[in-house]
């Protein structure tokens, strides 16, 4: 039986660092919100079977997304943290039968709206049949420094360092088990939760264009990337 690929987009955050008057996933770039650009990536990809967006129960912007993408599931069961939001989304996928434990869940940041389709294809092809799952990532290019107050305390050896991106692809059952802990402190992405089970996910070559909209100045770069598509 074919294993499904389900995109899960946690979009319950408020994006405080971005400094807008609304969550950054609802900031408009061009004629669409950031979240709409992100959803479109998965809806256009032939290997993705379903897209699910998990928002906050108090979300007042999601109706526009549902109108733009009536086939996408928009669930208002987000948690206080990203990990809780993903956990709630995966649990509902399993409870409703929309996902089997062996199906692939591709968790993707709502604010990464420039993911190239070829990077998504590469992740599915290389990690889609891997029991340990895998993530998009790129080797660290810059020299990294440790800080002590306002001074450099050490230079970090970067040879084996990779910068994690999304999507992060794992079987639904594995992801559900990895996020089942009552205390999810320190879990900043899905791979870190899976690693706590003693599993070593694959690193799949990502793409520098797959940046995360975090600071206000990032919007300029994102706009250029979207215009180039």
From Swiss-Prot:
Function (record text): Catalyzes the formation of 4-diphosphocytidyl-2-C-methyl-D-erythritol from CTP and 2-C-methyl-D-erythritol 4-phosphate (MEP).
Site (Positions MEP for the nucleophilic attack) location in chain: 158, 212
Keyword Metal-binding in annotation: no
Site (Transition state stabilizer): 17, 24
Pathway: Isoprenoid biosynthesis; isopentenyl diphosphate biosynthesis via DXP pathway; isopentenyl diphosphate from 1-deoxy-D-xylulose 5-phosphate: step 2/6
Enzyme class: transferase
Catalytic activity: 2-C-methyl-D-erythritol 4-phosphate + CTP + H(+) = 4-CDP-2-C-methyl-D-erythritol + diphosphate
UniProt entry keywords in alphabetical sequence: Isoprene biosynthesis, Nucleotidyltransferase, Transferase
InterPro entries cross-referenced by the UniProt entry: IspD, IspD/TarI, IspD/TarI_cytidylyltransf_bact, ISPD_synthase_CS, Nucleotide-diphossugar_trans
GO process annotations (BP): isopentenyl diphosphate biosynthetic process, methylerythritol 4-phosphate pathway
Higher taxonomy: Bacteria, Pseudomonadati, Pseudomonadota, Betaproteobacteria, Neisseriales
Domain of life per record: Bacteria
One term of GO molecular function: 2-C-methyl-D-erythritol 4-phosphate cytidylyltransferase activity
Assigned EC number: 2.7.7.60
Naturally occurring in which organism (per UniProt): Neisseria meningitidis serogroup A / serotype 4A (strain DSM 15465 / Z2491)
Name of the protein described by the UniProt record: 2-C-methyl-D-erythritol 4-phosphate cytidylyltransferase
Pfam families to which the protein is assigned, alphabetical: IspD
Family the entry assigns: Belongs to the IspD/TarI cytidylyltransferase family. IspD subfamily.
């Amino acid at each position: 039986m074919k294993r499904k690929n389900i995109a899960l987009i946690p979009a319950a955050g408020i994006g405080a660092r971005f400094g807008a008057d609304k969550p950054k996933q609802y900031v408009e770039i061009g004629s669409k919100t950031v979240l709409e650009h992100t959803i479109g990536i998965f809806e256009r990809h032939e290997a993705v079977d379903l897209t699910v967006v998990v928002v906050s129960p108090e979300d007042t912007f999601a109706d526009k997304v549902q109108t733009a993408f009536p086939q996408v599931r928009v669930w208002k069961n987000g948690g206080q943290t990203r990990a809780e939001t993903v956990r709630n989304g995966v649990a509902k996928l399993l409870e409703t039968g929309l996902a089997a434990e062996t199906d692939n869940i591709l968790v993707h940041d709502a604010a990464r709206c420039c993911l190239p389709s070829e990077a998504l294809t590469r992740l599915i092809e290389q990690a889609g049949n891997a029991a340990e799952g895998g993530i998009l990532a790129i080797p660290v290019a810059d020299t990294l420094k440790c800080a002590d107050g306002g001074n450099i305390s050490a230079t970090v050896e970067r040879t084996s360092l990779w910068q994690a991106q999304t999507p992060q692809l794992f079987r639904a059952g594995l992801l559900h088990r990895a996020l089942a802990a009552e205390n999810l402190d320190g879990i900043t992405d899905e791979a870190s939760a899976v690693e706590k089970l003693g599993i070593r996910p694959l690193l799949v070559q990502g793409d520098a264009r797959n940046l995360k909209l975090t600071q206000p100045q990032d919007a300029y770069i994102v706009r250029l990337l979207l215009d180039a598509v």
